[in-house]
C-alpha cells in the first residue's frame, strides 16, 4: 500500500515537472516565431533591380528579370518562351 502511494505521488510530481517544462517552452515559442517572421520581413525591404512574374512593366524597357519578358498586350512580366 505504501509503495503504491509513493509511486502515485512520484508520478504526479513527474507529471507536474513535465507540464511546467513544456509550458515554459510554449511561452518562448511565440517570441521565437515573431523574431523569425520579422527577420524574414527585413529581406522584403530590399528592392530587386528587376520585376518578377506578374509585375507591371513598360514594353521595350527590359525591366523584367531574366527568363521573363514584358507582354506588349497585357503590360506585365511573363515567362519568356523564346518565341
UniProtKB/Swiss-Prot annotation:
Disulfide bond in keyword set: yes
Signal peptide start-end: 1-21
Keyword Nucleus among UniProt keywords: no
A GO term from the CC aspect: host cell presynaptic membrane
Compartment list: Secreted
Tissue specificity note: Expressed by the venom gland.
This protein's name: Mu-theraphotoxin-Hhn2e
Amino acid at each position: 500500500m505504501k509503495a503504491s502511494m509513493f509511486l502515485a505521488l512520484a508520478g504526479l510530481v513527474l507529471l507536474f515537472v513535465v507540464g511546467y517544462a513544456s509550458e515554459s517552452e510554449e511561452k518562448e515559442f511565440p517570441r521565437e516565431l515573431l523574431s523569425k517572421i520579422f527577420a524574414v520581413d527585413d529581406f522584403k525591404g530590399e528592392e530587386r533591380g528587376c520585376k518578377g512574374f506578374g509585375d507591371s512593366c513598360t514594353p521595350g524597357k527590359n525591366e523584367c528579370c531574366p527568363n521573363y519578358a514584358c507582354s506588349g498586350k497585357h503590360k506585365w512580366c511573363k515567362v519568356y518562351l523564346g518565341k
